[in-house]
A protein has these predicted regions:
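Short coil/turn connectors at secondary-structure junctions
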Residues: 67, 83-84, 115-118, 154-156, ...
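Residue-level signal for inorganic ion chemistry
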Residues: 25, 51, 62, 95, ...
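An extended, acidic
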Residues: 147-264
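Solvent-exposed alpha-helices and their adjacent loops that cap or buttress functional pockets
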Residues: 39, 79-81, 114, 132, ...
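Short loop segments at secondary-structure junctions
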Residues: 112-116, 126, 135-138, 144, ...
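Small-residue (primarily alanine) positions within well-ordered alpha-helices
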Residues: 14, 18-21, 120, 139, ...
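DPxDG-like acidic metal-binding loop motif
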Residues: 81-140
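N-terminal subdomain of lithium-sensitive/metallo-dependent phosphomonoesterases centered on the IMPase/IPPase/PAP
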Residues: 1-92
């Protein structure tokens, strides 16, 4: 019971900070032409003051409520905590769509207990959609229960796919060819976190990305699991939580095909 209460207390805060951070991000989105944009890893990996301010806001709220918890943010890195819980936050997943006036971006907030994602909240402000999940509590979208459809397959639905400059053009081509050869089709929107939420919502049958970070995927993983899907575990032990890895989440009807394509 104590563990349940701990999770539910953090769930309430996770949704609150995702919504508050999303409102701040949306205010920047509506005046994005004023933002100064910087590059990180390469010219396609961009960041602005909006990312940093939203992350600082969320981190501050978490620190005030649960000072012993750990925190990993895309912009600020890892602060190891003293409790069993670690918050994993992407303040704006889909910065490129965000900066270019497209709606496909979101705020992603996950909470780990040990190495298990026990809370996942993804808020997409432009759609006014809030996806919420907690261990054993199911997944919801704006309060409505989510459940993946077991009749959906690679062949009768669409698959989400993402890639970045960590993935070679040759590998991207091979994955796309394998998807199409298996009778599937794919979509890419620029936000892996949001596409993972779409797996839970049944909008795509699965999502695969060969190299993704914890802050992009862990909230979505919790959502997919609680909606009845499967995900490939992400190594969160020690500093592995800061490293990229393969990410796959999928509904049951497409699991075998997508695991084969991903080599998992």
């Amino acid at each position: 019971m104590e563990s349940h209460d701990e999770i539910m207390a953090r769930l309430a805060l996770a949704e609150a900070v995702a919504r508050e951070g999303g409102a701040t991000a949306l205010s920047y989105f509506n005046r994005r032409e004023t933002l100064v944009v910087e590059t990180k890893y390469d010219l396609q990996d961009v960041v602005s003051i909006a990312d940093r301010e939203v992350e600082q806001l969320i981190a501050s709220r978490i620190r005030d409520a649960f000072p012993a918890d750990g925190f990993l943010g895309e912009e600020s890195g890892l602060q190891v905590g003293e409790s069993d819980y670690t918050w994993v936050v992407d303040p704006i997943d889909g910065t490129s769509p965000f900066l270019n006036g497209m709606p496909s971006w979101c705020v992603s907030v996950a909470v780990l207990r040990g190495d298990v994602p026990v809370i996942g909240v993804i808020f997409a402000p432009t759609y006014q959609e809030c996806y919420v999940a907690a261990l054993g509590q199911g997944a919801t979208l704006n309060g409505h229960r989510l459940q993946v459809d077991p009749t959906r397959t690679l062949q009768n639905h669409v698959t989400g796919f993402g890639a970045n400059s960590y993935v070679s053009p040759q590998q991207v081509g091979e994955i796309v060819a394998a998807l199409l050869s298996a009778g599937g089709n794919f979509i890419r929107i620029g936000s892996g976190a949001l596409m993972l939420a779409w797996v839970a919502a049944g909008r795509v049958v699965g999502y695969y990305e060969p190299y993704m970070h914890a802050w992009d995927c862990l909230a979505g993983y919790c959502l997919v699991k609680e909606a009845g899907g499967w995900y490939h575990p992400f190594n969160t032990e020690g500093d592995r939580i800061t490293k990229g890895a393969q990410v796959l989440a999928v509904a049951p009807g497409a699991e075998a095909d997508l695991r084969r394509i991903a080599g998992l």
